[in-house]
């Protein structure tokens, strides 16, 4: 992905903010600190490869955003998209708010649990989630949003196949599993047309 100098500078500022804040608040795992660019920035950026090409989706919601991963990275790369970031933990929410202000991102941030965010508040979205919940629970959490036409782009680790099989015991859904560009054992799962069995 080619990016402008301005975008690259924003990503670098964000990366440095993340590393500095991580000294006081557990935002990212200690083992990933030395490889933040690939492990977090690039990993999050690849979600954009799977955003719908049509103009029906002009916003995304990052649920359980944590350090703003992937939401902040996606917003920096695609500033024209409306961004909703949901994080209930105050310290993590505060970090996201600080990054939003310092980088002039104009994101809408909610210090709230996602189950309290109604589709009527944020509309139809691309739903992003990274390292949040098993797929079965994730679909339960987001089901009301799928009912209004949202789609999901979920980062999943090495147990992705098991998660899909478990989710299929309770849910009917269409999905595509794309090999992660940063870890060939992980997948980016694109989910839509979710129904209860």
Language-model features, listed with the residues they occupy:
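Conserved beta-strand positions in the Rossmann-like core of class I SAM-dependent methyltransferases
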Residues: 61, 84, 153
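Conserved SAM-binding loop of SAM-dependent methyltransferases across substrates and taxa
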Residues: 67-80
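Class I SAM-dependent transferase core
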Residues: 1-57, 61, 91-105
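Conserved beta-strand signature within the Rossmann-like core of class I S-adenosyl-L-methionine
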Residues: 149-160
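Active-site capping/gating segments
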Residues: 109, 159-197
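Conserved nucleotide-cofactor-binding alpha/beta core module
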Residues: 77-145, 158
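Conserved S-adenosyl-L-methionine
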Residues: 62-66
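A structural micro-motif
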Residues: 58, 81, 105-107, 150, ...
